[in-house]
UniProtKB/Swiss-Prot annotation:
Broad class of the protein's primary localization: cytoplasm
Protein name from the UniProt record: Small ribosomal subunit protein eS7
Keywords: Cytoplasm, Cytoskeleton, Nucleus, Ribonucleoprotein, Ribosomal protein
Record-annotated disulphide pairs: none
GO molecular function: structural constituent of ribosome
Physiological role: Component of the small ribosomal subunit. The ribosome is a large ribonucleoprotein complex responsible for the synthesis of proteins in the cell. Required for rRNA maturation. Part of the small subunit (SSU) processome, first precursor of the small eukaryotic ribosomal subunit.
Keyword Coiled coil: no
Lineage, top ranks: Eukaryota, Metazoa, Ecdysozoa, Arthropoda, Hexapoda
Record GO biological process: ribosomal small subunit biogenesis; rRNA processing; translation
Record localization: Cytoplasm, Cytoskeleton, Microtubule organizing center, Centrosome; Cytoplasm; Nucleus, Nucleolus
A Pfam entry, by short name: Ribosomal_S7e
Highest taxon in the source lineage: Eukaryota
Assembly and interaction partners: Component of the small ribosomal subunit. Part of the small subunit (SSU) processome, composed of more than 70 proteins and the RNA chaperone small nucleolar RNA (snoRNA) U3.
Source organism per UniProt: Spodoptera frugiperda
InterPro entries recorded: Ribosomal_eS7, Ribosomal_eS7_CS
Amino acid sequence: MSTKIIKASAAEPDVFETSISQALVELETNSDLKAQLRELYITKAKEIELHNKKSIIIYVPMPKLKAFQKIQIRLVRELEKKFSGKHVVFIGDRKILPKPSHKTRVANKQKRPRSRTLTSVYDAILEDLVFPAEIVGKRIRIKLDGSQLIKVHLDKNQQTTIEHKVDTFQSVYKKLTGREVTFEFPEPYL
C-alpha cells in the first residue's frame, strides 16, 4: 500500500491530506516504526489555526485506534518535527447517529447503540485528544445563562508531558464540538 489514506466513499484526498499520508509513508520506510505502521492508515486530516498557532487533527479508523495509540507518542514526535512544530492530535473517526423521533422510528429497525450517541462520541473525542494522559475526573459547570463549562481533571503524573499542549486541546475540542472545556491537573485525593 503506497498511500496511507483511505477515505470513506472513495473520495480523493486533498493536498494537505496527501502530505500527511506522504509523511506517514516516509516514516514507515526509514524508521523503527516500520512494523507497527505497515497495517495502519488514516481516514482524513484537517489543519486548523487558532490563536496564530496551527494544529493538525488526524482521524484514524476505529478498529486501528488502539494500534495507533501504542505508537502515538513516538509518531506525534516525528510528525511534529516534520511539520515544523505544529501540534498533532489523533482522533478516532466516529459516527453520531441522530436521535430517533416518532417519524424516524419506523425507518431504522435497530436501536441506536450507546457508542453512537452524541454524548458518548464527544466524551471519546476528549479521551483521544488528551492521550497518553488519563482523565481522572470531570465537572460540568452550568452558568445562569445556560452555557456550560466542562472542567476536565487530568492525571498529575502526565503534567510535564502534555501541559504545553493544553491550549491546543481546548481549541481543537471547541472547534470539533462547540463546547468550552478547561483542563486542570489537581493534586490526587488520598
